[in-house]
Swiss-Prot record:
Primary location: periplasm
Keywords linked to the UniProt accession: Periplasm, Signal, Transport
The protein's name: Glutathione-binding protein GsiB
GO cellular component labels: ATP-binding cassette (ABC) transporter complex; outer membrane-bounded periplasmic space
GO molecular function: peptide transmembrane transporter activity
Source organism, top-level taxon: Bacteria
Amino acid sequence: MTQFITHKWLAALGLASSIAAFPALAAKDVVVAVGSNFTTLDPYDANDTLSQAVAKSFYQGLFGLDKDMKVKNVLAEGYTVSDDGLTYTITLRQGVKFQDGADFNAAAVKANLDRASNPDNHLKRYNLYKNIAKTEVVDPATVKITLKQPFSAFINILAHPATAMISPQALEKYGKDIGFHPVGTGPYQLETWNQTDFVKVKKFAGYWQQGLPKLDSITWRPVTDNNTRAAMLQTGEAQFAFPIPYEQAALLAKNKNLELVASPSIMQRYISMNVTQKPFDNPKVREALNYAINRQALVKVAFAGYATPATGVVPPSIAYAQSYQPWPYDPAKARELLKEAGYPDGFSTTLWSSHNHSTAQKVLQFTQQQLAQIGVKARITAMDAGQRAAEVEGKGQKESGVRMFYTGWSASTGEADWALSPLFASQNWPPTQFNTAFYSNKQVDSDLAAALKTNDPQEKTRLYKEAQDIIWKESPWIPLVVEKLVSAHSKNLTGFWIMPDTGFSFDDADLK
């Protein structure tokens, strides 16, 4: 039964008020303050990293990613791939139970992948699984997955946070409402979900990893106000908070009871330019705008130093990423290129943003000022999620109003395909996926497709390098920065950290 708990947040002088009717803290109850709300507890139907991160309380996949974004076994013990790259045979961990008592086995894997790969279910993460032709039960501890075409990053897809193993009994019982009734093999099970306020999970006594979990419960609490989220740590109302607003970082670092952590990420921030529209169809214009942005200054102004200038179109910690010399800040060169392109007096355009939080606003204002110095007048619009879905993600090339678009991308598979194909492949123009530059290059398309058909690391490296070299030269983006992830936690909380894709890792979390 869902409990309903109400309270009113108050914040004054940087201190959060105490919370009325807040759930009583257990001996090892951890409160995690996060920056936005959750959309669903069904990982297959969530487009946001936060919902998938919280779902890791209940769910696990066959594989996962460690804090260095390397694939690790979780519910799988190993796998083999056929010579033609089409068939994956996976050996499963035995003796694992779902939280409703059902057995985890090959039939459970089949039920989940059949659901995920069926377009009739209209799941938001269908694109990850559309290459699955069939999933077969070999025996209770072995499953065989056949693909429609070779896809060498398939194990990374199975390691993606979306690929969770849900109890088949729960899928049958709850159907489309499974997002409200999570049942997995994870260390915690749902206790309460107040959809406007918090998700509370409690220790699953039947968890298969001996000695875990160490916490009694975790309360995931959305707190959209930056100051309130930081203040909850100061007052002890939360033991972990993310993201920490950059302007609050120095203050929290001085608190002897807290630890501030700036960790590496795979979150790249960039501005795409619609290369099918004037003036962005001209390569010299795109080069000019890249020369116009002082990325070192942007790091200081918008990110308080918690970012690094982008050195490519794929963050360095992603497999097969290529690094280049960052674009130098040279407004004189930018003006010269605009003149050569036929725009001696600059031009007017629009700059949209996929987010409207304070950091995005700072990036937009900084970029607007930088562009103005070379004669480019940009009218800025910071969008909410609904506007973004309708105006950017939902419209094709002919009807799209996108010209310049500030956004970010986190390739949660840890592999170059998911960092490149959704953003640069010709087939992935909106509304299919997120190629908001409407970029198209036949050689890039060929390289990306070929890289998925080979299991030879050297050949994959060559293909991904060639694709990135072309993209970097043709400049459909203004690559800006790779963010650092700033979190803070009570010093008596251990084993709880932020993953490079902005998800959470808390398998070994403990409260001393």
